Amino acid sequence: MKSTLMTASLLILVLLSIVDYASVYAELIDSEISMERHWINACFNICMKISSDQKYCKSFCG
């Protein structure tokens, strides 16, 4: 009985650490996507000020 309880406790700790790691990783991915969008918007805005060609700026900035 005691070993079953210890095994269950260990399993819960492992699962909690996996969930914690996954949430941190998801936040990292989300922040990278946000930074990429910010970069694309900034690139597009500067390109539009220079060339005023929307089609060119979309292809240039991604």
UniProtKB/Swiss-Prot annotation:
GO cellular component, one term: extracellular region
MF (Gene Ontology): potassium channel regulator activity; toxin activity
Family (UniProt): Belongs to the short scorpion toxin superfamily. Potassium channel inhibitor kappa-KTx family. Kappa-KTx 3 subfamily.
Known role: Potassium channel inhibitor (Kv).
Disulphide bond pairs: 43-61, 47-57
Domain notes: Has the structural arrangement of two alpha-helices stabilized by disulfide bonds (CSalpha/alpha 2(S-S)).
Signal peptide extent: 1-26
Proregion positions: 27-36
Location in or out of the cell: Secreted
Protein's recorded name: Potassium channel toxin kappa-KTx 3.2
Reported tissue expression: Expressed by the venom gland.
Keywords: Disulfide bond, Ion channel impairing toxin, Neurotoxin, Potassium channel impairing toxin, Secreted, Signal, Toxin, Voltage-gated potassium channel impairing toxin
